Amino acid sequence: FGSGAYAVYPGNNIKEHLQPFTEGALKLNGPTKMAAAVMPYYTISTGEGENVANGYNKYLITDVLRGTSGYEGVLCTDWGITKDITSVYKFEGKPFGVENLSEAERHYKAIQAGMDQFGGNNDMAPVLEAYKLGVAEMGEEGMRARFEESAVRLLTNIFRTGLFENPYLDVEQTTQIVGNSEFMKAGFDAQLRSVIMLKNSDKSLPLATKQKVYVPQRYMAPTTNWWGVTTEPKTVDAFNMEVVSNYFEIVETPGEADFALVGIQSPDGGVVYDASDLEKGGNGYVPINLQYGTYTAETASEVIIAGGSPLEDFTNRSYKGKSVTTINTTDMQLV
Protein backbone atom coordinates (compact mmCIF):
# COMPACT_ATOMS: atom_id res chain seq x y z
CA PHE A 1 0.00 0.00 0.00
CA GLY A 2 1.05 3.59 -0.55
CA SER A 3 0.79 4.13 3.20
CA GLY A 4 3.90 1.99 3.63
CA ALA A 5 6.01 3.28 0.77
CA TYR A 6 9.16 3.98 2.80
CA ALA A 7 11.77 1.77 4.44
CA VAL A 8 14.05 3.44 6.97
CA TYR A 9 17.26 2.15 8.54
CA PRO A 10 17.81 3.68 11.99
CA GLY A 11 21.45 3.83 12.99
CA ASN A 12 22.54 3.50 9.36
CA ASN A 13 22.18 -0.29 9.60
CA ILE A 14 21.45 -0.90 5.93
CA LYS A 15 24.24 -3.51 5.85
CA GLU A 16 22.29 -5.76 8.23
CA HIS A 17 19.26 -5.57 5.94
CA LEU A 18 21.39 -6.59 2.96
CA GLN A 19 22.68 -9.77 4.63
CA PRO A 20 19.85 -12.05 3.42
CA PHE A 21 21.03 -11.17 -0.09
CA THR A 22 24.79 -10.94 0.32
CA GLU A 23 25.17 -13.88 2.72
CA GLY A 24 22.21 -15.94 1.54
CA ALA A 25 20.69 -15.62 -1.91
CA LEU A 26 23.99 -14.63 -3.53
CA LYS A 27 26.09 -17.37 -1.88
CA LEU A 28 24.36 -20.66 -2.61
CA ASN A 29 25.93 -24.11 -2.68
CA GLY A 30 24.07 -25.22 -5.82
CA PRO A 31 25.37 -25.11 -9.41
CA THR A 32 23.99 -21.62 -10.09
CA LYS A 33 25.95 -20.27 -7.07
CA MET A 34 23.28 -17.62 -6.54
CA ALA A 35 19.52 -17.15 -6.81
CA ALA A 36 18.34 -17.38 -10.41
CA ALA A 37 16.08 -14.35 -9.98
CA VAL A 38 15.53 -11.64 -7.38
CA MET A 39 12.83 -9.07 -6.60
CA PRO A 40 14.22 -5.91 -4.95
CA TYR A 41 10.98 -5.05 -3.02
CA TYR A 42 8.41 -2.28 -3.33
CA THR A 43 9.60 0.30 -0.85
CA ILE A 44 11.73 3.40 -1.14
CA SER A 45 14.95 2.68 0.76
CA THR A 46 15.28 6.12 2.27
CA GLY A 47 18.74 7.64 1.92
CA GLU A 48 20.10 4.88 -0.34
CA GLY A 49 20.58 6.62 -3.65
CA GLU A 50 17.59 8.30 -5.25
CA ASN A 51 14.42 8.22 -3.13
CA VAL A 52 12.43 5.99 -5.47
CA ALA A 53 11.13 2.44 -5.13
CA ASN A 54 13.96 -0.10 -5.17
CA GLY A 55 13.02 -1.31 -8.66
CA TYR A 56 13.82 2.17 -9.99
CA ASN A 57 16.91 2.74 -7.85
CA LYS A 58 19.99 2.50 -10.07
CA TYR A 59 22.33 2.76 -7.10
CA LEU A 60 20.85 -0.31 -5.39
CA ILE A 61 20.31 -2.35 -8.57
CA THR A 62 23.35 -1.57 -10.71
CA ASP A 63 25.94 -0.31 -8.24
CA VAL A 64 25.24 -2.50 -5.19
CA LEU A 65 23.55 -5.66 -6.48
CA ARG A 66 25.18 -5.97 -9.90
CA GLY A 67 28.45 -4.23 -9.09
CA THR A 68 29.50 -4.77 -5.47
CA SER A 69 27.73 -8.13 -5.07
CA GLY A 70 28.37 -9.37 -8.61
CA TYR A 71 24.83 -10.58 -9.18
CA GLU A 72 24.30 -11.97 -12.69
CA GLY A 73 20.75 -13.36 -12.46
CA VAL A 74 17.38 -11.98 -13.45
CA LEU A 75 15.99 -8.94 -11.68
CA CYS A 76 12.20 -8.82 -11.78
CA THR A 77 10.25 -5.85 -10.50
CA ASP A 78 7.78 -6.35 -7.70
CA TRP A 79 4.19 -6.76 -8.82
CA GLY A 80 2.58 -3.71 -10.38
CA ILE A 81 5.18 -1.04 -9.64
CA THR A 82 4.65 0.58 -13.05
CA LYS A 83 0.87 1.00 -12.67
CA ASP A 84 -0.90 4.15 -11.46
CA ILE A 85 -2.10 4.73 -7.91
CA THR A 86 -4.99 6.96 -6.80
CA SER A 87 -5.04 6.43 -3.04
CA VAL A 88 -2.70 5.26 -0.29
CA TYR A 89 -5.22 2.69 0.92
CA LYS A 90 -6.30 1.08 -2.36
CA PHE A 91 -4.60 -2.04 -3.69
CA GLU A 92 -3.43 -0.53 -6.98
CA GLY A 93 -0.08 0.24 -8.58
CA LYS A 94 3.02 0.94 -6.50
CA PRO A 95 4.97 3.59 -8.43
CA PHE A 96 6.50 4.95 -5.24
CA GLY A 97 8.68 7.97 -5.89
CA VAL A 98 7.81 8.09 -9.60
CA GLU A 99 4.11 8.90 -9.41
CA ASN A 100 4.67 11.89 -11.71
CA LEU A 101 6.02 9.74 -14.58
CA SER A 102 3.94 8.09 -17.29
CA GLU A 103 3.68 4.31 -17.36
CA ALA A 104 6.12 4.12 -20.28
CA GLU A 105 8.57 6.44 -18.49
CA ARG A 106 8.42 4.21 -15.41
CA HIS A 107 9.30 1.18 -17.52
CA TYR A 108 12.21 3.05 -19.03
CA LYS A 109 13.48 4.21 -15.64
CA ALA A 110 13.37 0.62 -14.33
CA ILE A 111 15.29 -0.56 -17.38
CA GLN A 112 17.87 2.17 -16.82
CA ALA A 113 18.19 1.05 -13.20
CA GLY A 114 19.06 -2.47 -14.36
CA MET A 115 15.78 -4.42 -14.18
CA ASP A 116 15.13 -7.27 -16.62
CA GLN A 117 11.47 -8.17 -16.18
CA PHE A 118 8.24 -6.43 -15.18
CA GLY A 119 6.20 -8.28 -12.59
CA GLY A 120 2.44 -7.96 -12.98
CA ASN A 121 2.54 -6.41 -16.45
CA ASN A 122 1.15 -8.40 -19.39
CA ASP A 123 0.95 -5.42 -21.73
CA MET A 124 3.81 -4.95 -24.18
CA ALA A 125 2.76 -1.42 -25.18
CA PRO A 126 4.54 0.50 -22.36
CA VAL A 127 7.63 -1.68 -22.83
CA LEU A 128 7.77 -0.80 -26.54
CA GLU A 129 7.25 2.87 -25.66
CA ALA A 130 10.11 2.60 -23.17
CA TYR A 131 12.26 1.15 -25.96
CA LYS A 132 11.51 4.21 -28.11
CA LEU A 133 12.47 6.50 -25.22
CA GLY A 134 15.76 4.66 -24.95
CA VAL A 135 16.44 4.89 -28.67
CA ALA A 136 15.87 8.64 -28.51
CA GLU A 137 18.40 8.95 -25.68
CA MET A 138 21.09 6.39 -26.53
CA GLY A 139 20.42 5.38 -30.12
CA GLU A 140 19.02 2.17 -31.63
CA GLU A 141 22.24 0.21 -31.17
CA GLY A 142 22.63 1.13 -27.52
CA MET A 143 19.02 0.39 -26.56
CA ARG A 144 18.98 -2.89 -28.47
CA ALA A 145 22.14 -3.95 -26.63
CA ARG A 146 20.44 -3.13 -23.32
CA PHE A 147 17.38 -5.24 -24.21
CA GLU A 148 19.57 -8.15 -25.34
CA GLU A 149 21.43 -8.01 -22.03
CA SER A 150 18.17 -8.74 -20.21
CA ALA A 151 17.11 -11.29 -22.84
CA VAL A 152 20.26 -13.33 -22.17
CA ARG A 153 19.52 -13.45 -18.44
CA LEU A 154 15.88 -14.45 -18.98
CA LEU A 155 16.67 -17.11 -21.58
CA THR A 156 19.48 -18.56 -19.47
CA ASN A 157 16.99 -19.65 -16.81
CA ILE A 158 14.73 -21.22 -19.44
CA PHE A 159 17.65 -23.11 -20.98
CA ARG A 160 18.80 -24.30 -17.56
CA THR A 161 15.46 -26.03 -16.97
CA GLY A 162 15.59 -27.73 -20.37
CA LEU A 163 12.45 -26.11 -21.72
CA PHE A 164 13.95 -25.59 -25.17
CA GLU A 165 15.66 -28.96 -25.53
CA ASN A 166 12.67 -30.96 -24.27
CA PRO A 167 9.45 -28.97 -23.88
CA TYR A 168 7.17 -32.00 -24.00
CA LEU A 169 5.36 -33.66 -21.11
CA ASP A 170 6.04 -37.33 -20.37
CA VAL A 171 2.49 -38.47 -19.58
CA GLU A 172 3.59 -41.83 -18.20
CA GLN A 173 5.99 -40.19 -15.77
CA THR A 174 3.41 -37.57 -14.78
CA THR A 175 0.76 -40.15 -13.89
CA GLN A 176 3.26 -41.81 -11.57
CA ILE A 177 3.95 -38.54 -9.74
CA VAL A 178 0.69 -36.56 -9.65
CA GLY A 179 -1.68 -37.96 -7.03
CA ASN A 180 0.87 -40.56 -5.95
CA SER A 181 -0.55 -42.21 -2.81
CA GLU A 182 2.87 -42.41 -1.17
CA PHE A 183 3.48 -38.70 -1.70
CA MET A 184 -0.02 -37.83 -0.48
CA LYS A 185 0.51 -39.85 2.69
CA ALA A 186 3.82 -38.12 3.31
CA GLY A 187 2.14 -34.73 2.89
CA PHE A 188 -0.71 -35.65 5.22
CA ASP A 189 1.72 -36.95 7.84
CA ALA A 190 3.66 -33.69 7.62
CA GLN A 191 0.45 -31.74 8.24
CA LEU A 192 -0.35 -33.88 11.26
CA ARG A 193 3.10 -33.24 12.71
CA SER A 194 2.60 -29.49 12.21
CA VAL A 195 -0.45 -29.40 14.51
CA ILE A 196 0.42 -27.95 17.92
CA MET A 197 -1.50 -29.07 21.01
CA LEU A 198 -1.31 -26.36 23.66
CA LYS A 199 -2.60 -28.48 26.52
CA ASN A 200 -4.15 -31.87 27.23
CA SER A 201 -3.73 -32.10 31.00
CA ASP A 202 -6.88 -34.14 31.61
CA LYS A 203 -6.10 -36.53 28.74
CA SER A 204 -9.23 -35.56 26.83
CA LEU A 205 -7.49 -36.37 23.57
CA PRO A 206 -7.46 -38.49 21.53
CA LEU A 207 -11.21 -38.86 21.25
CA ALA A 208 -13.01 -42.06 20.43
CA THR A 209 -14.64 -41.99 17.01
CA LYS A 210 -18.38 -41.65 16.47
CA GLN A 211 -18.91 -39.58 19.59
CA LYS A 212 -21.51 -36.83 19.36
CA VAL A 213 -20.05 -33.44 18.45
CA TYR A 214 -21.44 -29.91 18.41
CA VAL A 215 -19.75 -27.62 15.86
CA PRO A 216 -20.81 -23.94 16.19
CA GLN A 217 -20.77 -21.78 13.09
CA ARG A 218 -18.64 -18.64 12.85
CA TYR A 219 -20.11 -15.17 12.26
CA MET A 220 -18.16 -12.84 9.98
CA ALA A 221 -18.98 -9.13 10.26
CA PRO A 222 -19.08 -6.95 7.11
CA THR A 223 -15.69 -5.58 6.14
CA THR A 224 -13.47 -4.32 3.35
CA ASN A 225 -10.43 -6.48 2.71
CA TRP A 226 -7.00 -5.39 1.52
CA TRP A 227 -8.04 -5.93 -2.13
CA GLY A 228 -10.70 -3.26 -1.57
CA VAL A 229 -13.50 -5.83 -1.83
CA THR A 230 -16.45 -5.29 0.52
CA THR A 231 -17.88 -8.46 2.04
CA GLU A 232 -21.38 -8.87 3.42
CA PRO A 233 -22.01 -10.27 6.92
CA LYS A 234 -22.25 -14.03 6.88
CA THR A 235 -22.32 -17.13 9.03
CA VAL A 236 -20.03 -19.94 7.90
CA ASP A 237 -19.05 -23.46 8.89
CA ALA A 238 -15.71 -23.52 10.68
CA PHE A 239 -14.83 -26.91 9.19
CA ASN A 240 -15.74 -29.14 6.27
CA MET A 241 -18.77 -30.76 7.85
CA GLU A 242 -18.72 -33.68 5.44
CA VAL A 243 -15.27 -34.60 6.70
CA VAL A 244 -16.34 -34.13 10.34
CA SER A 245 -19.26 -36.51 9.77
CA ASN A 246 -16.83 -39.23 8.72
CA TYR A 247 -15.49 -39.36 12.28
CA PHE A 248 -18.25 -38.09 14.57
CA GLU A 249 -22.02 -37.81 14.84
CA ILE A 250 -22.93 -34.14 14.37
CA VAL A 251 -25.67 -32.79 16.67
CA GLU A 252 -27.55 -29.49 16.63
CA THR A 253 -27.21 -28.36 20.26
CA PRO A 254 -24.45 -28.43 22.91
CA GLY A 255 -26.73 -30.38 25.25
CA GLU A 256 -26.80 -33.34 22.89
CA ALA A 257 -23.03 -33.47 22.46
CA ASP A 258 -20.21 -35.37 24.11
CA PHE A 259 -17.85 -32.54 23.15
CA ALA A 260 -17.64 -29.39 21.02
CA LEU A 261 -15.34 -28.73 18.09
CA VAL A 262 -14.80 -24.97 17.86
CA GLY A 263 -12.95 -23.35 14.98
CA ILE A 264 -11.68 -19.78 15.29
CA GLN A 265 -9.15 -17.55 13.56
CA SER A 266 -6.61 -15.03 14.79
CA PRO A 267 -8.05 -11.56 15.50
CA ASP A 268 -8.68 -9.73 12.23
CA GLY A 269 -8.36 -6.00 12.80
CA GLY A 270 -8.60 -4.96 9.18
CA VAL A 271 -5.95 -3.18 7.11
CA VAL A 272 -4.99 -0.35 9.55
CA TYR A 273 -6.72 2.19 7.31
CA ASP A 274 -10.35 3.31 7.33
CA ALA A 275 -11.72 5.36 4.43
CA SER A 276 -14.74 6.39 6.52
CA ASP A 277 -12.37 8.03 9.04
CA LEU A 278 -10.96 10.11 6.19
CA GLU A 279 -14.46 11.07 5.06
CA LYS A 280 -15.24 12.27 8.60
CA GLY A 281 -12.23 14.61 8.60
CA GLY A 282 -9.61 12.25 10.06
CA ASN A 283 -6.37 11.17 8.42
CA GLY A 284 -7.65 7.66 7.63
CA TYR A 285 -5.14 5.83 9.82
CA VAL A 286 -6.40 3.54 12.57
CA PRO A 287 -4.54 1.31 15.06
CA ILE A 288 -3.63 -2.34 14.62
CA ASN A 289 -5.91 -4.51 16.73
CA LEU A 290 -4.37 -7.81 17.82
CA GLN A 291 -7.05 -8.72 20.34
CA TYR A 292 -10.64 -9.92 20.12
CA GLY A 293 -13.13 -7.13 20.71
CA THR A 294 -12.46 -3.40 20.58
CA TYR A 295 -9.08 -1.74 21.04
CA THR A 296 -8.61 1.99 21.60
CA ALA A 297 -5.18 3.54 21.05
CA GLU A 298 -5.18 5.60 24.24
CA THR A 299 -1.40 5.69 24.67
CA ALA A 300 -0.34 6.16 21.05
CA SER A 301 1.91 9.07 20.11
CA GLU A 302 0.25 12.39 19.45
CA VAL A 303 2.42 12.90 16.39
CA ILE A 304 3.61 10.19 14.00
CA ILE A 305 5.49 11.86 11.16
CA ALA A 306 5.40 8.99 8.69
CA GLY A 307 3.71 10.80 5.83
CA GLY A 308 5.24 12.01 2.62
CA SER A 309 3.00 10.51 -0.04
CA PRO A 310 2.12 12.93 -2.85
CA LEU A 311 -1.44 11.64 -2.43
CA GLU A 312 -1.66 13.16 1.08
CA ASP A 313 -1.49 16.78 2.21
CA PHE A 314 -0.31 15.99 5.75
CA THR A 315 2.54 14.14 7.46
CA ASN A 316 1.03 13.30 10.87
CA ARG A 317 -0.44 9.80 10.71
CA SER A 318 -1.24 9.51 14.41
CA TYR A 319 -4.25 7.38 15.34
CA LYS A 320 -4.31 8.24 19.04
CA GLY A 321 -7.77 7.89 20.57
CA LYS A 322 -9.19 5.91 17.66
CA SER A 323 -10.83 2.52 18.13
CA VAL A 324 -10.93 -0.63 16.02
CA THR A 325 -13.17 -3.65 16.55
CA THR A 326 -11.97 -6.96 15.13
CA ILE A 327 -14.11 -8.40 12.37
CA ASN A 328 -14.25 -11.81 14.04
CA THR A 329 -14.74 -10.69 17.65
CA THR A 330 -17.48 -13.33 18.08
CA ASP A 331 -14.84 -16.08 17.71
CA MET A 332 -13.84 -15.56 21.33
CA GLN A 333 -17.48 -15.75 22.39
CA LEU A 334 -17.64 -19.22 20.83
CA VAL A 335 -14.79 -20.33 23.06
Predicted region positions:
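Glycoside hydrolase catalytic-domain context in secreted enzymes
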Residues: 1-335
